[in-house]
Amino acid sequence: MKLRETIMKLVFLIAACCSVLAVALICIFLFMNGVPAIFKIGPLKFLTGTVWKPGNNIFGILPMIVGSICVTGLAILMGVSVAILTSVFLSRYCPKKFYGICKSGINLMAGIPSIVYGFFGLVVIVPLMAQLTGKNGNTMLTASILLAVMILPTVVGVTESAITSVPESYYEASLGLGATHSQSVFFAVVPAAKSGILAGIVLGIGRAIGETMAVIMIAGNQPRMPKGITEGLRTMTANIVLEMGYASGLHREALIATGVVLFVFILLINLSVSMLNRRVHYGD
């Protein structure tokens, strides 16, 4: 029995080490290949430059940084509110006979490939936006709407689990104080699940900022500063995918450096939310 436990501990340790090693190797590859390129180009020119012309050895990724932030921010604003309300409905309002149907539909959304979402956006959302704005439908707003739909399953899944895990005593105590069902849900249960909701939002941000295929199909892909939500743009992930296939030399290194910037962005978001979570816990 002890031998079996020792073997299982060793297996778990190896699995954990493999996971950590994979992340470490990715970090080493990115920073070894990307950071030197940033210093070759010049950190200020690379991060704040507004012109991307690889043919002229001009590599300014500020338009792609702004594009990624704007698209992700709009998607989160639109998607998170819908996701939280959906989670509340599923966990506290949805009749049992409809729960399975609703949950299956959301799970199905999570399994749809990005290319299918992109095709849907290209065929349905882009023409609709073109009619509404009188411009090309490949815009920031179009990409944000599609990303908001794409992050729903991720945020709903985590948020619903967080709301469901809140002890029933919170809800019952609120009812005992004279609150209605809705007041108890929104002012007692949901606030108690805020840590899980924040985790869901972080996962949603990660999904949105890292999405590539669907964004390439509908965002316009112009490497220039976006001037409004009805203008086209290019994100950092789209920039890497569109040009990595034929890039070489400093151009290729600049694309890897773009990946470094994206990695740092994700890291900063995770650290920020982690610190916010600690404040929430200390506040409780």
Across the structure, where does each feature detected by a protein language model lie?
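Cytoplasmic-entry segments and transmembrane alpha-helices of multi-pass inner-membrane transporters
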Residues: K9, V82-G121, D284
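Interhelical loop and adjacent transmembrane-helix boundary motif
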Residues: V215-F263
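Generic hydrophobic transmembrane alpha-helix motif, especially the helices
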Residues: N107-L147
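Amphipathic cytosolic juxtamembrane alpha-helices at the membrane-cytosol interface
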Residues: E5, P95-G100, E168, E172-A199
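Transmembrane alpha-helices
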Residues: V158-T159, H181-M217
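Transmembrane alpha-helix signature in integral membrane proteins
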Residues: F59-F89
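C-terminal transmembrane helix and the adjacent membrane-cytosol boundary/short C-terminal tail
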Residues: E160-T164, E168, L175, L242-D284
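Short membrane-interfacial helix/loop motifs at transmembrane-helix boundaries
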Residues: C27-I58, P223-T230
